[in-house]
């Protein structure tokens, strides 16, 4: 355990010298009789790129009309150090500032000598035209807009928070995000996996302490996977989940879960070679099995986790924009660890279970859970009616193996048998429903029902970025881009639950609807996702008059979507 503490401490110390945005760039403004000035004071070892410096008055670029100071040369780039003064004489202002209240926009990007590049920065100033003079306001970050206009998406605000706040506040906040995510369905697929692994390792020496230790190993490596995958994904410019959701990869991991299930049934055992077992036994009497727990924790985060939530997307946007992979990776690690806190309590609770013969039934139960997880993984690439058939068959076998035909004498055994009868009845219904083409788990015997949600909304399918860009700029109607994929579970939920709602269908009649299918994760799709700052479906982006107004990452209910898009 001590080594984990050392690793985390070293991880944190890496950021001791990193300046926050406020420390790196201090923007000021002043008004004079014949001019105004904008000053950018730079922190220690910070420099600005001259070709990234832009100044606008009422959306008109006046960068080429400003007398800039002499720049320094750094490699092949012209840069500014220490302080940059931008003087704007009244004669220039009178040419472009025709209104009483005008808007000045300043854009720049800077880096530090340590190799860190900050987000491109945008600052705004109000320019008031008075008789024979101009007055400039103090700088502010967010452009003032009508209350009905929604500019910043949730993940963008999180990315900006990463870029501007204190390092330890960032980690604490992302730990809080993780705790909130633990209250959502994101964590549910992890529970049966961890529980079955712990039960599989049970023996006479099984204890609360050891159970908690196994849970910690699982959560630690799950968190490590999120951090590593996030950093790699940012460098690739696409979601690592998109790569790992290829059909061949999904089939491979489904086979792994099937293998674990048969191991639960006692068909075979996973064991290290004898030489390694002897080495581990010498190091720790309880060491055997920890490697397997760690591997499953790592893989569970990459494959089983169904959510690409706003905190994750926000961290990825920050990493991609700045190259600060360590800070973004740390935030992802802490967020994932917070998300795994309930798993630690589950492991601790399993430690109170006393082993005995009845545990064999528990292992069989979790074996079927593993098979259910394998089917769930394959549901991303197989038609829904075939998935119903598979679950129906699994339910029948589960009822038999768990003792539906055994005699019942006690109240507990009778309750158990009643539950198994209900499971058997439901399993037969979804099996028959699947045979006749049904796709709804809640209404499997309604054979004539065809999901209206898939046909209620009319979409155009465009995957080419240039075509999307042209459509956004030229279309007179508001536009909704729907980033989706065949393997995306939450995308299916959006279609089945949110976009089947009559209120949403009615509201969407005012929009041009475009689906962007990123199932294949090819170069064109990766480019499109990168251009729109999308790190994994589902993502909904709303445009109006060629400008992005709202971005939603992950599943959203019909009620919540209406609140966001209604004026």
Swiss-Prot record:
GO terms for cellular component: plasma membrane. Disulfide bonds join 111-117, 186-307, 488-491. Residues 430-567 form the Thioredoxin domain. The keyword Nuclease does not apply. The chain crosses the membrane at residues 167-187, 212-232, 248-268, 290-310, 333-353, 362-382, 386-406, 418-438. InterPro entries: Cyt_c_assmbl_TM_dom, DsbD_gamma, DsbDN, DsbDN_sf, Thiol_diS_interchange_DbsD, Thioredoxin-like_sf, Thioredoxin_domain. Residues 17-166, 233-247, 311-332, 383-385, 439-567 are periplasmic. One of its GO terms (biological process) is cell redox homeostasis. It catalyses: [protein]-dithiol + NAD(+) = [protein]-disulfide + NADH + H(+); [protein]-dithiol + NADP(+) = [protein]-disulfide + NADPH + H(+). Keywords: Cell inner membrane, Cell membrane, Cytochrome c-type biogenesis, Disulfide bond, Electron transport, Membrane, NAD, Oxidoreductase, Redox-active center, Signal, Transmembrane, Transmembrane helix, Transport. It is a multi-pass membrane protein. It is found in: Cell inner membrane. Its EC number is 1.8.1.8. It comes from the Bacteria. GO terms for molecular function: electron transfer activity; protein-disulfide reductase [NAD(P)H] activity. CDD domains: DsbDgamma. Residues 188-211, 269-289, 354-361, 407-417 are cytoplasmic. It holds the Pfam family Thioredoxin. Residues 1-16 form the signal peptide. Belongs to the thioredoxin family. DsbD subfamily. Required to facilitate the formation of correct disulfide bonds in some periplasmic proteins and for the assembly of the periplasmic c-type cytochromes. Acts by transferring electrons from cytoplasmic thioredoxin to the periplasm. This transfer involves a cascade of disulfide bond formation and reduction steps. This is Thiol:disulfide interchange protein DsbD. It comes from Campylobacter jejuni subsp. jejuni serotype O:2 (strain ATCC 700819 / NCTC 11168).
């Amino acid at each position: 355990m001590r080594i984990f503490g050392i690793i985390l401490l070293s991880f944190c110390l890496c950021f001791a010298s990193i300046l926050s945005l406020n420390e790196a760039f201090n923007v000021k403004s002043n008004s004079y009789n014949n001019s105004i000035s904008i000053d950018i004071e730079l922190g220690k070892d910070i420099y600005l790129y001259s070709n990234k410096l832009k100044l606008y008055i009422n959306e008109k670029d006046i960068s080429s009309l400003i007398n800039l100071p002499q720049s320094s040369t750094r490699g092949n780039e012209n840069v500014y150090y220490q302080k940059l003064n931008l003087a704007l004489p009244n004669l220039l202002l009178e040419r472009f500032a025709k209104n009483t209240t005008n808007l000045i926009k300043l854009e720049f990007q800077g880096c530090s000598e340590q190799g860190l590049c900050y987000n491109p920065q945008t600052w705004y100033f109000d320019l008031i035209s008075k008789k024979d003079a101009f007055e400039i306001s103090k700088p502010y970050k967010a452009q003032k807009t009508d209350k009905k206009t929604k500019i910043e998406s949730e993940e963008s605000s999180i990315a900006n928070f990463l870029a501007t706040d204190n390092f330890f506040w960032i980690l604490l906040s992302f730990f809080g995000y993780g705790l909130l995510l633990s209250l959502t369905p994101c964590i549910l697929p992890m529970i049966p996996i961890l529980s079955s692994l712990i039960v599989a390792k049970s023996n006479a020496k099984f204890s609360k302490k050891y159970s908690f230790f196994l849970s910690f190993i699982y959560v630690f490596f799950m968190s490590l996977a999120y951090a590593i995958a996030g950093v790699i994904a940012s460098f690739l410019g696409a979601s690592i989940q998109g790569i790992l959701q290829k059909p061949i990869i999904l089939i491979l991991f489904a086979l792994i879960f099937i293998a674990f299930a048969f191991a639960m049934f006692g068909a075979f055992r996973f064991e290290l070679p004898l030489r390694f077992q002897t080495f581990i036994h010498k190091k720790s009497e309880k060491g055997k099995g920890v490697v397997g727990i760690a591997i499953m924790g790592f893989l569970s985060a990459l494959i089983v986790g169904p959510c690409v939530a706003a905190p994750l997307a926000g961290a990825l946007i920050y990493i991609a924009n700045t190259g600060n992979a360590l800070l973004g990776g740390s935030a992802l690690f802490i967020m994932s660890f917070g998300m795994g806190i309930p798993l630690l309590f589950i492991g601790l609770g399993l430690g109170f279970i006393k082993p005995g013969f009845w545990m064999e039934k528990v292992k069989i139960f979790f074996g079927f859970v593993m098979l259910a997880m394998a089917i769930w993984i394959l549901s991303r690439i197989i038609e829904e009616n075939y998935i119903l058939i598979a679950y129906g068959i699994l339910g029948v076998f589960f009822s038999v193996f768990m003792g539906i035909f055994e005699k019942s004498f006690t109240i507990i055994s009778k309750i158990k048998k009643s539950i198994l009868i209900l499971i058997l009845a439901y399993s037969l219904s979804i099996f028959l429903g699947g045979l006749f083409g049904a796709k709804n788990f809640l209404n499997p015997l309604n054979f004539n029902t065809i999901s209206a949600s898939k046909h209620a909304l009319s979409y155009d399918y465009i995957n080419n970025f240039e075509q999307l860009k042209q459509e956004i700029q030229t279309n007179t109607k508001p536009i909704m881009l729907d980033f989706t994929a065949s393997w995306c579970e939450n995308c299916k939920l959006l279609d089945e639950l949110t976009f089947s709602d009559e209120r949403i269908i009615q509201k969407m009649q005012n929009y041009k609807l475009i689906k962007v299918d990123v199932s294949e994760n090819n170069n064109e799709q990766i480019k499109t996702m990168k251009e729109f700052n999308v790190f994994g479906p589902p993502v909904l982006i709303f445009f109006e008059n060629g400008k992005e107004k709202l971005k939603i990452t992950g599943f959203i209910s019909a009620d919540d979507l209406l609140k966001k898009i209604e004026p």
